Regions:
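N-terminal pre-domain/capping segments
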Residues: 1-87, 93
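Surface-exposed, active-site-proximal loop segments in enzymatic domains
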Residues: 64-83, 106-116, 200-210
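An active-site-proximal structural segment forming one wall of the substrate-binding cleft
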Residues: 75-99, 117-131
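Active-site groove signature of glycoside hydrolases
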Residues: 88, 92-112, 131, 136-140
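Acidic/histidine-rich catalytic cores of soluble enzymes
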Residues: 122-212
Length: 213
């Protein structure tokens, strides 16, 4: 099932105090194969130039996610978020980034996918299909939304799965997400936490610790 050559990358989302060029050069010297970033439009050209200069793979762009819940509602707010994510897809294509990591939902109170949401995500899927960008839908809270997207768009070439080990432990309560979506695996996030620490799941459980610590 999982055949091929795999490359190991690391988050380049900031915090080092280094320039993009110096940061990527350091990762290359240490032995990383690639890196992923957030969607910082002011630095996209720098990321691409550094990846090419040091023969590194720019593996993915993590799309904005704080407003994704509005995509499941009718109306302008959801359409605006959808438009933003479509632009992120276009930037992935323009800067030769093969995967856009995307959250299907954010929040812990709602659990009902809607037709409006599926239409909005359908616009993103169609754009990614046309541009050859793989969408790595991440296992986060709200598994119902991930399931609905996979059911609706199963036959689309852009539909992919980004497996987050830490999210599986806390947000998914240890459920085997690879058993559900491993056939579409296109990206991974390896990190750790201590599981659900209270009666209810909350984002503070998602500690993003180094694995094994």
């Amino acid at each position: 099932m999982f055949k091929g050559t795999y490359k190991i990358g690391i988050n380049l989302m900031g915090g080092s105090g280094l320039s993009v060029d110096d940061h990527v050069a350091l990762l290359h010297r240490i032995g990383w194969d690639g890196f992923f970033t957030g969607w910082n439009r002011e630095k996209l050209s720098e990321f691409r130039a550094a990846a090419d200069k040091y023969d590194m793979i720019w593996q993915s762009i993590h799309a904005p996610f704080t407003q994704v819940r509005y995509m499941w509602d009718e109306g302008e707010p959801g359409e605006q978020v959808t438009d933003e994510l479509i632009q992120c897809v276009r930037d992935c294509a323009a800067y030769r980034v093969p995967v856009m990591v995307i959250h299907p939902f954010i929040g812990f109170e709602e659990h009902t996918p809607t037709e409006a949401g599926l239409r909005n995500f359908g616009r993103i899927v169609s754009e990614a299909d046309a541009l050859g960008v793989r969408l790595g839908f991440e296992n986060v809270e709200g598994e119902e939304y991930l399931a609905a997207i996979f059911e609706r768009y199963a036959d689309h070439p852009s539909l992919g799965f980004c497996f987050d080990t830490g999210h599986e432990l806390c947000y998914n309560r240890g459920k085997d997400m690879l058993a559900e979506y491993g056939h579409a695996l296109c990206h991974t996030h390896f990190n750790d936490n201590v599981g659900v620490t209270g009666e209810d799941i909350f984002w503070t459980d998602d500690l993003h610790l180094v694995m094994g610590i």
